C-alpha cells in the first residue's frame, strides 16, 4: 500500500520485503520471510505522488534491491528507469544489492543507473576479501565474481560512488583471511566502508561457532578504520578545486545545508 507523503525532501519507498539469501550470520530471512516484490506500477505511483509533493530524492530500498522481481517476473532495471523517467527535478538512489543477485543482469542495472536522474551510487556489500570465508558465510558468490561486478560498474560509470559492508572478525576469519580483506579494500578503494564487528545473532547458523578473541577483533577493526580514513582522504583530495552538482535535502544542525 503506497505511503502517504509527508512533504519531506527525501521519500523512501520499500520495493520488496524478504530475502533470497542464506548468509550464516544473518536472521533477516527468518524475520522477514520469503521474498515479496511490490508491483512496479504501485511503486511508480508512490514516487510520482512524493515528487508532486516536493520530494527531490527518491530512495528505493529493500533488504536486497537486487532480488526485486525474482518472484514476480519484473525487473529492478525497469523499475529504476520508470521512476527516473517521471517528470520533475529529483534524483533516485538505489539501495543495497546482494552481489549474487545481479550476476546475471549486471549490464541492465548499470544501464539503468546511468540514467541522468539516478545517483552514480551502488551499495554492494562484500563482507570479506577471502573466498574461504565467503563460502563459509554462504554468500553465494566468489571474490572474482564480486570484482568483476565492480570492474564493470567502474568502467561504465567512472565517477561511481561505491559503498561496501565489511564484517570484522567472523569466527573462521584467520589472520590470512583478514589480510585478504585489507588487500581487497586497497584494491577497489570504496568511497564508503561500513564496518561492523561480528557478533552472534540468535538463530543465525554462525552463532554455533566459537567467536575469535575480542582483542583480535578490536585490533582488526582499528586497522580497517585507519584504511577507511586513508581511502576517504585520498578521494577527497582528488576533488579539491572541482565543481560538483548537489541536491539539498535538509537543513544542517547549524542552519546551513
Where are these regions (language model features)?
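Canonical Radical SAM [4Fe-4S] cluster-binding loop centered on the CxxxCxxC motif
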Residues: 6-41
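Conserved alpha-helical substructure of the radical SAM core
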Residues: 30-59
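Short, ordered loop/turn segments at secondary-structure junctions
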Residues: 31, 63-65, 198
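Short glycine-enriched, charge-decorated loop/helix-capping segments at active-site entrances
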Residues: 32-33, 135-141, 207-213
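Conserved SAM/AdoMet-binding glycine-rich loop
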Residues: 52-175
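Conserved N-terminal phosphate-binding loop of PLP-dependent enzymes in the Aspartate aminotransferase
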Residues: 88, 106, 190, 205-211, ...
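Contiguous mid-protein beta-loop-alpha structural module that forms a pocket-lining wall or clamp
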Residues: 173, 185-190
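Terminal RNA-binding accessory module
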Residues: 199-200, 208-257
